[in-house]
Amino acid sequence: MYKRQVLSSDVSAAFDPNYPSVMDKKNAAYFGKGMVFNKYTGSRGKSGSNDASAEYVGKLRAVMDDGNVFYQTAELGKVDQGGGGTIAYILANYGMQVIDSGVAVLNMHAPWEIISKADLYEAYKGYVAFLAS
């Protein structure tokens, strides 16, 4: 498994205009802008974190561009605001190149979650392009 390249499929919190102070507007995931990549993930600052290398992100950008996939990059919300826990760090502990990828979700973990159908389709295209590369 060492040096394998992996996409950790997960969702990303979408910008919520009702709670704008939780996220930085310029680094948040938005509906209708495509598949989301989170280069850095973790909770409580640096606990259980993963940071994808610039080289790996560059390769993924080329794969997505070649596959005509719409994508966006995003960051987590404020430190200690909650959320951000993923399994990417576990895969990275085995020496894999890994980045979180998926769709933006509003109301994550609530009874009624919302996503963009267009983003879901772009994520599908992104995973197909990645597996074909």
Regions found by a protein language model. Name each.
Residues 13:
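Short, glycine/acidic-enriched loop or turn micro-motifs at the edges of active sites
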Residues 103-133:
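His/Asp/Glu-rich mid-to-C-terminal helical/loop segments that flank catalytic regions of hydrolases
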Residues 16-19, 23-112:
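Active-site-adjacent substrate-binding region
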Residues 1-2:
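Conserved small/polar residues in nucleotide/adenosyl-binding loops
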